[in-house]
Amino acid sequence: EHIHAHWASTPSTVAYIASAISNIPWSFTAHRWDIAENNMLEEKARTAEFIRGIDEQGLSELASIINEKYRYKLNKIHVGININCRNRDNNFLYGNDNNFIIITPANLVLKKGHRYLIEACKLLIKKGITNFKCYFFGDGYLHEDLLILIKEHNLEEYISIKGQIPHNELLNLYKNKNIDLIVLPSIVDKYGNKEGIPSALTEAMAYGIPVISTNTGGIPELIGDGSGIMVNQKDPLALADAIEKLMKDSEYYKTIAEKGRKKVEDEFNVNKIAQELLNLFEINKKTN
C-alpha cells in the first residue's frame, strides 16, 4: 500500500495526514505554483518517501526550500501524455479559406502572455502577411481586456477568442488537421507565476504540430533543443518572425514538426512515465 498525491498543496496535506493516521507510506508530486507557495514542504519532505518534480526548474526550487538532508528524496519525472493514434502527417495545410491556422489553447491569464501574440499578429499584417487566422481557446479574467486590445489594433478579422472547448474536441482539431501552429507566448507574470512543462505544447507536438513558446519556466526543457521554436518572453517581434518563417518555409515546418513529435514520443510517453513512477513505488516498498 502507498499513498501518492498530486500537488504539494491541499492534496498532499491530506495525504500527509492520512499517512500519519494509517501508517501507510506516502509521496507526492509537486508541479509549479504549489512549490512557490511552500505548503509545509519541509515537514512533508521529512515524512514522505519521495518527492516527484515534473521539470528541472521545479526540482531546483524544491531543493532550495527543503532541508539538505531530505534532498535525496527528490526525483524528476515528467508528466506523460497518451501518444496513441497520432496519425497526422507533418504537412501544413492552410486549412480554412487558405489561411494558416494558429491557436493558443490556454486560460486567459497573465502568465500565458496573449497580448504579445496579439502584438505579433499586428506586426505580421504590417509586413503584408495576412493569410492567417489566430484563435484563443480558453476563458479567464483577461477576456474583456484582450477583446479591447484586439479591437484597438483592428485585428477582429484575424484574431478571435473562442472560449473554452472540451479537451476531446481540441484533440480532434489536431487529429483532423485543422490546426497549423500552436503559439504559447508565456511570461513570468508580476506575481512570479510561470509555466511548468505545458501539456498544451506536448499534446500538439505529439500530433506533429509545430509549437512556438518562450524561455520561461520548464519550457526550455521541452523545446530548447530545437523540438519547437523558443523565443524570449514579451518579444512580439521574435514571435512574428518565428511565425513568418514557419508559414513560408515548408521544409523548416516539417523539420520542427518531426523533431517535436519525436521528443514527445521519446520522453513524454505516458507508458514510460508511468513505469518510472512505478519503479519509485517499488524501490520504496523494498526499503519499508
Stretches with model-predicted labels:
Residues L222-P236, K245-E251, D266:
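Conserved acidic donor-binding segment of nucleotide-sugar-dependent glycosyltransferases
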Residues K194-L201, I219:
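Short glycine/serine-rich donor-binding loops of glycosyltransferases
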Residues K175-K194, I209:
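Acidic donor-binding loop of glycosyltransferase active sites
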Residues I35, L41-R88:
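Donor nucleotide-sugar binding/catalytic pocket of nucleotide-sugar-dependent glycosyltransferases
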Residues L201, A206, P210-S213:
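Short hydrophobic beta-strand element within catalytic cores of glycosyltransferases
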Residues E144-N176, D180:
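Nucleotide-activated donor-binding/catalytic signature segment of Leloir-type glycosyltransferases, i.e.
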Residues Y158, A238, K245, Y252-E267, ...:
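A short, well-ordered alpha-helix in the C-terminal region of glycosyltransferases
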Residues F100, T104-L123, Y141-L147, E195, ...:
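A conserved mid-protein helix/loop that constitutes part of the nucleotide-sugar donor-binding site
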